[in-house]
Amino acid sequence: MYNFIDSGKVHTTDTYVNVLNAVKKEGANYHQATIGELLSVDSSLKIQVLHVDANADDNNDASIVLKVSYRDMDTLLTGDADTNIESQMLQKYNVESEIIKAGHHGSNTSSSLAFLRAVKPEAVILSYGKGNSYGHPHSEVKNNIKTVGAKAYSTAKSGNIVVTSDGYTFTINAKPFEANATSPTQTSKNQSGVVSRAPIKFSNCTEMRKYYPNGVSSSHPSYDEKHDRDNDGWACEK
């Protein structure tokens, strides 16, 4: 390892501390990315940072978004950037790319139709676990992929996915799967205030607000102290 590129967003978890310790142990160069900069990796590659935010309130909004260009081929790596960040990037950059790694594991917090239409991808790679508790990839995202006419590839179905390119064409070591158009994720609530088909646990407030726009109280099954930053018994309120 020679370089470690980070968003600069500080975490307090053991995992984050362990990562920083590993970087130090390996003697790698720690580098905090900045919006618009070009990362130097190889003279034949152009890697531009389209988004990063060390001061983001939501960890996902701190995501580093990269556009990797090799000759005539472009690949967009979006991290967990949500639809608001997608809109910001559309106003500043040409995001058109042959390949995109769908944001946030195929969550409906990312991969808006407007964004995918601007990207004009030939292939969309969805990275998510089989039978995950979040319901990824969400039906809205599958609909959007189908609408723009891209082929979808799934790590849950194919495992590790490798893209090989000479800079003009590319091959993928997996078979595309049908991102069938389906009904939008249901958001009706039962008597306990729990949205049907919603995950019980959410990794961040952006995801939670897709189902619970006003957040949840401490009595709700989806309440988590880490989302209640002001300790008022209500998580992810606006």
Describe the function of each predicted region.
Residues 1-192:
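Non-globular, low-confidence helical/coil segments that flank catalytic cores
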Residues 185-238:
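Mature, structured domains enriched in cysteine- and short glycine motifs
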